[in-house]
Amino acid sequence: MTLSSLLFASLLLVSKAETATPQFQHALPNVAGKKLVSVVVDYPPGAKSAPHRHAPSAFIYAYVLSGSIRSQLEGEPAAKIYHADESWFENPGAHHVVSENASDTQSAQLLAVFVVNTDEALTVPDAH
């Protein structure tokens, strides 16, 4: 087996997961116990987030910076694809059952802005 074949095979074994990078966090001085947090989520081609819940206090604004994101919250009839420059809102405690790159060939990037209690995690993965 050639070196390039081995490298390609090892790439296929790597899990395609998103990467969330905090960009900003600041306590809201006029709203006691709340903070504003922004996170950029990078999705390689074909990457998916594990199902998760958002904090019970978190109001979320999501904006697609590039590519296309497929998203579905519990109770929605089907997943929706959001393209670059499109956005949506998520209510506190939302259960994200689908959150993934809609493309297997292009990367996607999402900006998520949270208003959340200062003592809460932004997301909690579903129990397996």
Model-derived regions, located:
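Hydrophobic helical h-region of N-terminal Sec-dependent signal peptides
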Residues: 3-12
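Sec/Tat signal peptide C-region and signal peptidase I cleavage site
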Residues: 11-19
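A short glycine-rich, His/Asp/Glu-containing loop-to-beta-strand
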Residues: 20-51, 57
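Extracytoplasmic
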Residues: 33-38, 56-59, 77, 93, ...
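Short histidine-centered beta-strand/loop micro-motifs
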Residues: 49-55, 73, 80-81, 99-102
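Ligand-binding loop in jelly-roll beta-barrel domains
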Residues: 70, 78, 94-121
